[in-house]
């Protein structure tokens, strides 16, 4: 590997305790300002989705904008779903939960997000001929506050693998993004 740009590792495994799916992007040397910006946008996207609260009855289509807004506000996008359901000793891509901005009927992944569902949170950015970046954690859907508006849910992250902090461009992060 050359000491430049990024190395993207997408890995996982099947265990009696569950199925894992993770992606990390690692810097292999000095990066350009654009590479640092893109790495940071991917991280912001993942963190914002991981921190969202939502009412029961919500589907991934309703949450996808939270993850894509950092890209769309800059005229950027990634051409894959933001997340997919993760099975237990079955398929790493499992129905019925998923997070994407448009319907893909053959995926059958537009189910209501339920307590106990595990979903990947994996935004990315791919610039043809330059670099590809993705950061993926698994998130668990959990009950949160219940009030007069209904039952709120939230995500708890399940992935504890470090992220390359030296690559982050804090100048483009809001105070809230840094806190996440």
Segment roles from a protein language model:
Residues 1-180:
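Active-site neighborhoods and metal-handling regions in enzymes and metal-associated proteins
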């Amino acid at each position: 590997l050359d000491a430049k740009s990024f190395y993207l590792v997408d890995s996982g495994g099947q265990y009696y305790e569950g199925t894992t799916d993770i992606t990390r992007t690692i810097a292999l040397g000095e990066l350009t300002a654009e590479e640092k910006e893109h790495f940071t946008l991917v991280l912001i996207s993942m963190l914002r989705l991981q921190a969202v609260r939502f009412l029961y009855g919500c589907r991934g289509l309703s949450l996808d904008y939270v993850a894509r807004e950092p890209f769309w506000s800059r005229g950027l996008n990634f051409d894959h779903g933001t997340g997919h359901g993760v099975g237990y000793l079955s398929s790493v891509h499992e129905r019925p939960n998923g997070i994407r901005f448009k319907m893909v009927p053959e995926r059958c992944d537009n189910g209501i997000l339920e307590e106990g569902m595990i979903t990947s949170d994996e935004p990315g950015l791919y610039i043809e001929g330059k670099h590809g970046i993705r950061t993926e954690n698994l998130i668990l859907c959990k009950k949160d506050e219940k009030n007069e508006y209904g039952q709120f849910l939230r995500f708890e992250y399940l992935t504890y693998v470090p992220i390359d902090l030296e690559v982050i461009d804090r100048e483009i992060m809001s105070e809230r993004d840094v806190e996440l």
